[in-house]
Every structure is written in C-alpha cells, then in structure tokens.
C-alpha cells in the first residue's frame, strides 16, 4: 500500500467519524442528506460482498467492516434515532436518476461479467455521484454547518488522494484501472466548486453557502 492510498483511507475515515460525531453530539441530523447516506450504504454493501470470500489483509478486512457498519449506523441515526430532526423537505434529489443509470452502466462497462464484478463496478460508478443529494440539499438551504463542511471537505480530499494513488500505482506497478480513474475524476470534479468555497469561506471562519 502506498502513502496516497493510506492517507486517502484516513481522510475517508475522518469524514465518516466527523459525520457520526456531528449527529450524535448535536442529537440532530439537520443539514445531512439521508439520501446520500443511503447511497453510500448501498455503495459499501455492493462493493464489499466479497468480505467473506476474498481475504487480502487484516487492514483491508477491518476497513471493509468499518465502512459498512458506519454507513448503516449513519442511516439508522437519520431515519430512526433522530428522525424528528431530519429535513426531508430539502432532501428532495431524485436518487433514481443516479441509481438506474449507474446500474445499467455497470452491466455494460465492467472488467468481467460476473455478479461480484458487476456489483463492484456499480459501487464505483454510484460512489462517484452519491454526494450529489448532499450538495443539492446544501444548495437548496443556502448554507451548511461548519462541521458538515469539514465532512464534505474530508470526503473530497479522500477522492483526490485516491487519484494520486492510481497515478502512483500506474507509475510504479504498471497497474491501470480506467473505470476507477474515470469515476474518481468525476467525483473530484463535483467537489471542485465546494473546495473553492471551503477555502475562501470556511477556513476564514465564515459559513459555507452554495449558489441556489
């Protein structure tokens, strides 16, 4: 494992921890898109169905378990534990416009036409756009809490570091995964506007807001 992947994993884990702490400490999921979190739960479930059949390392297995457990815990907190604080009126993105196209694309463009490989590919495609409901929600409300902004920034850093991970692997290992790279580029592009606002506003102590 190279440094970029390790730092990317840490950034991803930090994002998840920030989100869970935000919800638990405030006893509220206001400003959090439940739809994005459901999509992430679907992403990790589809990607890690090989948990009991494909052992790579203890680190890899532990990270898979953590991602799945945390994603479903987040969904439970939003839709059950703190359901009364969930802002469904602003979380209105039509997720079927994300799930259906990525599922079809996974059937058409994949590395191997097997159930696990198609599900893995689907998870890669879906993850690249899973944050859209959250960004759409921030756009509708006009602003985001600072901790939510930190969560989104950490997710963006995770994807950016993973792009460097692919570059590193291609240069030093000759490994090239076009599906993962293109999906990673799409996801990183979606964060570009947010990165700019985060640096120019949040880091200066202001609240983050997106153009409505």
From Swiss-Prot:
Changing residue 158 to F: Loss of recycling together with cargo proteins containing the sequence motif K-D-E-L from the Golgi to the endoplasmic reticulum. It holds the Pfam family ER_lumen_recept. One of its GO terms (biological process) is retrograde vesicle-mediated transport, Golgi to endoplasmic reticulum. The keyword Phosphoprotein applies. The chain crosses the membrane at residues 5-24, 33-52, 59-79, 93-110, 117-135, 150-168, 179-199. One of its GO terms (cellular component) is endoplasmic reticulum membrane. Residues 1-4, 53-58, 111-116, 169-178 are lumenal. InterPro entries: ER_ret_rcpt. Residues 204-207 are annotated as: Important for recycling of cargo proteins with the sequence motif K-D-E-L from the Golgi to the endoplasmic reticulum. Changing residue 32 to A: Decreased binding to the sequence motif K-D-E-L. It is a multi-pass membrane protein. Residues 47-48, 159-169 are annotated as: Interaction with the K-D-E-L motif on target proteins. Residues 25-32, 80-92, 136-149, 200-212 are cytoplasmic. One of its GO terms (molecular function) is KDEL sequence binding. Upon ligand binding the receptor oligomerizes and interacts with components of the transport machinery such as ARFGAP1 and ARF1. PANTHER family: ER LUMEN PROTEIN RETAINING RECEPTOR. Receptor for the C-terminal sequence motif K-D-E-L that is present on endoplasmic reticulum resident proteins and that mediates their recycling from the Golgi back to the endoplasmic reticulum. Belongs to the ERD2 family. This is ER lumen protein-retaining receptor 1. It comes from Homo sapiens. The gene is KDELR1.
